[in-house]
């Protein structure tokens, strides 16, 4: 593990699939969730008692470095994951949510080799190169399901006033309806 060799040229690689990493893929769970359809097609596991803890898979990156990950199926959620070795890969590659992992296999030769590469997401949010907020640009950030969601900014007081006006209009409308019904009700009682 970690050995560097002459990298396999891209023409000798056959693309298998890509996965945009999520916050949980690069977070404290220390695992990469492999989409089930790709896992079963490209990294099949034989269901035996001897490999209950998974198997070790070797992947070569674009620099010729070999990475070893434990690959297993979590029976509780029927999820396929790369675990042991994944957090080190994330750290060394500087992966962040939104980056893409590219999996490929050898296109030639009798041995089926596996390759892993990273494509960085170049948006400001993914690289941490956000510009400083100047006055008047303050935005509200809410964390929901592990994602930071920024508000559209704007003047919140306008929205609050619209809600207040909406309540007043509702009460006035309700009063008018009551007044309209009362005379008719009174006429019926006479």
From Swiss-Prot:
Domain of life: Eukaryota
Residues spanning the signal sequence: none
Subcellular location: Nucleus
Keyword hit for Protein biosynthesis: no
One Gene Ontology cellular component annotation held by this UniProt entry: nucleus
Name this polypeptide is given: B3 domain-containing protein Os02g0764100
Broad class of where this protein is predominantly found: nucleus
Keyword annotations: DNA-binding, Nucleus, Transcription, Transcription regulation
InterPro entries, sorted: B3_DNA-bd, DNA-bd_pseudobarrel_sf, LEC2-like
GO MF annotation terms: DNA binding; DNA-binding transcription factor activity
CDD domains: B3_DNA
DNA-binding region, residue intervals: 17-121
């Amino acid at each position: 593990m970690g050995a560097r060799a002459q990298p396999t040229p891209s023409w000798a690689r056959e693309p298998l699939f890509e996965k945009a990493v999520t916050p949980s893929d690069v977070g404290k769970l220390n695992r990469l969730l492999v989409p089930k359809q790709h896992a079963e097609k490209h990294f099949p596991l034989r269901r035996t008692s001897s490999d209950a803890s998974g198997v070790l898979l070797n992947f070569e990156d674009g620099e010729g470095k070999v990475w070893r990950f434990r690959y297993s199926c979590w029976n509780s959620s029927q999820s396929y994951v790369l675990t042991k070795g994944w957090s080190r890969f994330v750290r060394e590659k500087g992966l962040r949510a939104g980056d893409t992992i590219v999996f490929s296999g050898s296109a030639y030769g009798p041995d089926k080799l596996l390759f892993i590469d990273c494509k960085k997401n170049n948006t400001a949010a993914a690289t941490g190169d956000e510009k400083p907020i100047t006055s008047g640009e303050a935005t509200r950030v809410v964390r929901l399901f592990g994602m930071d969601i920024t508000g559209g900014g704007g003047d919140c007081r306008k929205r609050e006033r619209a809600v207040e006006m909406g309540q007043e209009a509702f009460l006035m409308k309700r009063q008018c309806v009551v007044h309209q019904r009362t005379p008719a009700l009174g006429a019926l009682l006479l």
